[in-house]
Amino acid sequence: MFGFHKPKMYRSIEGCCICRAKSSSSRFTDSKRYEKDFQSCFGLHETRSGDICNACVLLVKRWKKLPAGSKKNWNHVVDARAGPSLKTTLKPKKVKTLSGNRIKSNQISKLQKEFRRHNSDAHSTTSSASPAQSPCYSNQSDDGSDTEMASGSNRTPVFSFLDLTYWKRQKICCGIIYKGRFGEVLIDTHLFKPCCSNKKAAAEKPEEQGPEPLPISTQEW
């Protein structure tokens, strides 16, 4: 088997005066022999001189073989290899995007991890709370919950990873919840306990009684 042979490359410091290529597999030559045909062959409006690559020399020779009266030229090769083309420069990079379902699952798993981490911190905080701070609030009024905007609160929220411009912190009779703009609810099991009043009402609710039995007469006839 023959080994791979790397072709020899020829280089020019100033580059080809037509296409501006600075390297070629063929030698560069002086452009004096072809300068008189540059205007018609390449559609140039200025005089160019210097080195010329073999590819541009072949284009000049091909132009000379065109039939008389032909207006064909190779203006598109002028300065074509001066640098990266505009198309290459402005071409946006392809970014691998995940599907919507995969992104959503990743966000959910990340949220669950944050919940676990913050729940462990919240549990150690709530376990040492005084009885007055228990989840059963007996002194609250009947007109609902004490709603606080999380962005306006001075204390640091337990869930520091939440978007405070979207979630509202609400203190209800069963504890503390975070409510979203569209009705979503986030609950921390360490800060949310069943309401004492609901338990008491369920215990005091009389059991449903069936129909009273008809009295049995004991009189002898």
Swiss-Prot record:
Record's protein name: SIN3-HDAC complex-associated factor
Main localization (coarse): nucleus
Entry keyword set: Nucleus
Renumbered residue ranges of the record's region Disordered: 112-152, 201-221
Record's compositionally biased regions (Low complexity): 124-135
Composition skew (Basic and acidic residues), residue ranges: 112-121
Top-rank taxon: Eukaryota
GO cellular component, one term: Sin3-type complex
One GO BP: negative regulation of cell differentiation
Pfam families found in the cross-reference section: FAM60A (PF15396)
Record bears the keyword Nucleus: yes
Subunit record text: Component of the Sin3/HDAC corepressor complex at least composed of BRMS1, BRMS1L, ING2, SAP30, SAP30L, HDAC1. Found in a complex composed of at least SINHCAF, SIN3A, HDAC1, SAP30, RBBP4, OGT and TET1. Interacts with SIN3A and OGT.
Function (record text): Subunit of the Sin3 deacetylase complex (Sin3/HDAC), this subunit is important for the repression of genes encoding components of the TGF-beta signaling pathway. Core component of a SIN3A complex (composed of at least SINHCAF, SIN3A, HDAC1, SAP30, RBBP4, OGT and TET1) present in embryonic stem (ES) cells. Promotes the stability of SIN3A and its presence on chromatin and is crucial for maintaining the potential of ES cells to proliferate rapidly, while ensuring a short G1-phase of the cell cycle, thereby preventing premature lineage priming.
Biased composition (Polar residues): 136-152
